[in-house]
């Protein structure tokens, strides 16, 4: 594993158990894994950027070789270079993810040919989980246990107790 440093990026709005599975698996493959939280300019955030970062940090706190980094704006390859990353880590749930990632990898490789991209297939029972589906469940106050880390559940319960709009 010597010298292999990974970067797994996303908006994590919110972080799901699917994301966590990818992060845990990557932590066994790399000496160090950075998890870069970004804002997606094509999506309006459900949770604030700060709250997403906080929940993600709480979710990965038991993984000693994982560090959450905030990169509100910019390109993943720029952050990867800044952190001396050797590999971008991407998760695939289905063929739609594959098509999207193939296009993204083309541009990442053009911008940073020295950084390799690796793909991890989602664990079968976690493939249906997506942040957008979780947001729908939260909006209707449906149970999310088993779909997201405890940090997300705690935050949603806190907001529901205060009757706040998320």
UniProtKB/Swiss-Prot annotation:
Coiled coil: none annotated. SUPFAM superfamilies: Nucleotidylyl transferase. It catalyses: (R)-4'-phosphopantetheine + ATP + H(+) = 3'-dephospho-CoA + diphosphate. Its EC number is 2.7.7.3. Substrate binds at residues 11, 43, 76, 90. It comes from the Bacteria. One of its GO terms (molecular function) is ATP binding. InterPro entries: Cyt_trans-like, PPAT, Rossmann-like_a/b/a_fold. Pathway: Cofactor biosynthesis; coenzyme A biosynthesis; CoA from (R)-pantothenate: step 4/5. It is found in: Cytoplasm. It is an enzyme of class 2 (transferase). ATP binds at residues 11-12, 19, 91-93, 101, 126-132. Keywords: ATP-binding, Coenzyme A biosynthesis, Cytoplasm, Magnesium, Nucleotide-binding, Nucleotidyltransferase, Transferase. Its cofactor is Mg(2+). One of its GO terms (cellular component) is cytoplasm. Pfam families: CTP_transf_like. GO terms for biological process: coenzyme A biosynthetic process. Homohexamer. Reversibly transfers an adenylyl group from ATP to 4'-phosphopantetheine, yielding dephospho-CoA (dPCoA) and pyrophosphate. Belongs to the bacterial CoaD family. This is Phosphopantetheine adenylyltransferase. It comes from Streptococcus equi subsp. zooepidemicus (strain H70). The gene is coaD.
């Amino acid at each position: 594993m010597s010298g292999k440093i990974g970067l797994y990026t996303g908006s994590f709005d919110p972080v799901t158990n699917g994301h966590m599975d990818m992060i845990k698996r990557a932590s066994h493959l790399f000496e160090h894994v950075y998890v870069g939280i970004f804002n997606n300019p094509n999506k309006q955030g459900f949770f604030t950027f700060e709250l997403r970062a906080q929940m993600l940090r709480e979710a990965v706190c038991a993984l000693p070789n994982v560090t959450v980094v905030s990169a509100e704006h910019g390109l993943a390859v720029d952050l990867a270079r800044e952190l001396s990353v050797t590999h971008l880590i991407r998760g695939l749930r289905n063929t739609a993810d594959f098509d999207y990632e193939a296009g993204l990898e083309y541009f990442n490789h053009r911008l940073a040919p020295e950084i390799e991209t690796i793909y991890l297939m989602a664990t079968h029972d976690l493939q249906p989980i997506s942040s957008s589906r979780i947001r729908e469940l939260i909006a209707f106050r449906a149970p999310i246990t088993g779909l997201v880390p405890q940090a997300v559940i705690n935050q949603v319960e806190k907001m529901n107790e205060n009757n706040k709009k998320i």
